[in-house]
Amino acid sequence: MPHESSPDSQHEHGVAVEAARPEVAPPPFYQVMLLNDDYTPMDFVVDVLQQFFSMDLDKATQVMLHVHTRGRGVCGVFTREVAETKVAQVNEYSRMNQHPLLCTMEKA
């Protein structure tokens, strides 16, 4: 008696065996960090947080004050490609506006 097979299972002696599906690990995430400096105006930092990280004024102000008092702060957590893009955008925008504000990323 012929056995029928489907893409998801094989029949061996009347027992259905599901084909193994490869496990895919979730992508690693990275924190995008702003570093404090003594020259970049606070309102510029708030503008960066609103423009590049879609924060409202209250949240952007809170993060800016955290960066100012603690030396650095998290702007968001993203996949590597998104984090790299945001770091490059913020650093380029800061240089274009003649500010030394530095944005970095580290594994979350």
From Swiss-Prot:
Region annotation Disordered: where it falls in the sequence: 1-22
Disulfide bonds: none
InterPro entries from the UniProt entry: ClpS, ClpS_core, Ribosomal_bL12_C/ClpS-like
Any one Gene Ontology BP term: proteolysis
Pfam families: ClpS
SUPFAM superfamilies: ClpS-like (SSF54736)
Comp. bias intervals (Basic and acidic residues): 1-15
Origin superkingdom: Bacteria
Family, as annotated: Belongs to the ClpS family.
PANTHER family with a match to the protein in the record: ATP-DEPENDENT CLP PROTEASE ADAPTER PROTEIN CLPS, ATP-DEPENDENT CLP PROTEASE ADAPTER PROTEIN CLPS1, CHLOROPLASTIC
Assembly with partners or alone: Binds to the N-terminal domain of the chaperone ClpA.
Function: Involved in the modulation of the specificity of the ClpAP-mediated ATP-dependent protein degradation.
Name of the featured protein: ATP-dependent Clp protease adapter protein ClpS
Biological classification of the source: Bacteria, Pseudomonadati, Pseudomonadota, Gammaproteobacteria, Lysobacterales
